[in-house]
Amino acid sequence: MAPVSALAKYKLVFLGDQSVGKTSIITRFMYDKFDNTYQATIGIDFLSKTMYLEDRTVRLQLWDTAGQERFRSLIPSYIRDSSVAVIVYDVASRQSFLNTTKWIDEVRTERGSDVIVVLVGNKTDLVDKRQVSIEEAEAKARELNVMFIETSAKAGFNIKALFRKIAAALPGMETLSSTKQEDMVDVNLKSSNANASLAQQQSGGCSC
């Protein structure tokens, strides 16, 4: 196995309104679990995972951002050096879908076209409460020239597919000729303290 230090690193920033499931998607991907107890993300959380695929390996740095308005001023600094922006909405919340336009605009303002943007419709398990059709979301993705996928962090639906889709789109990935393992985990869990304004916040973890 190639040493971790040799891996190319890619920064993924998760953006979207509060309670759309950004943290739940990350938690399902990292640990294959789902927490029904909702706790809002405070500021920015950071985790990393090394993915070993059939012919390549990548180190994904996952930055989980708070959706609350009071933390919006912190987000541009995390977007600026990102490789991927994952814009999440709740398929049962039309407003969260409409708001993805401003999230994408914010990413494009900071990064131009030099970033991969993925639109993610989460909570597909809420079948009876769906307010956004897959056809409408696909049309928006085409219009804005971004990738698109629907997921359910609760059911574990399409979570691995989301990250495989991202990995396949990343430039300059290293090739492993002999590695056949998949989804081996190298976890580093931190809470960012780069912003003094977060020092007064009490972090209760994040589960959504």
Curated annotation (Swiss-Prot):
A motif (Effector region) lies at residues 38-46. GO terms for cellular component: cytosol; endosome; Golgi apparatus; Golgi membrane; membrane; plant-type vacuole; plasma membrane; plasmodesma. The modification Cysteine methyl ester is found at C208. One of its GO terms (molecular function) is GTP binding. GTP binds at residues 16-23, 64-68, 122-125, 152-153. Keywords: Cytoplasm, ER-Golgi transport, Golgi apparatus, GTP-binding, Lipoprotein, Membrane, Methylation, Nucleotide-binding, Prenylation, Protein transport, Transport. It is a lipid-anchor. Protein transport. Regulator of membrane traffic from the Golgi apparatus towards the endoplasmic reticulum (ER). Binds GTP and GDP and possesses intrinsic GTPase activity. Belongs to the small GTPase superfamily. Rab family. This is Ras-related protein RABH1b.
